Amino acid sequence: MQLTNLADVDTNLETTDHLTKGMLEGALPDKRFRRHITDAVVEVINSEPDSELRRVFRDNTLTYAAVLSTGKYSLAAYVNAVKFVSLKLMGDKSSTAYSKVFPDRYQNLIDKGASGSYIASFADNYSKTGLITKIMEQTMVPTHILNAG
């Protein structure tokens, strides 16, 4: 069997690791969220200085957007939750992920002289919220897919 030459296909190569409003708009499950897409929401992802980590945040934000249709969550809360889950999946402890996602809250606790275990309790509490739990459920790969092949 001989293969014939196929015409070159113009592909849209990924040239950026930044999230755009258009990308987010296309991933959202419902039109009601689209009006809440602001520069500030997009900047939560794009402000990450490490381009590889920024790419992970962007991809996960686009991948898990269906979670928004399962409850009453704000877009900003969703983006922060995705960052938190992404950091946890990459090996950060809850308190470390919490400090990266909410640096102002973390610094406020430090300024008040909170102990490490006290701060960890806030992070642990956040990790058990409904939104975080639903995003974590989305990250789980079914066993039949893992064992396929």
Explain the meaning of each model-derived region.
Residues 1-147:
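N-terminal, charge-rich alpha-helical recognition modules
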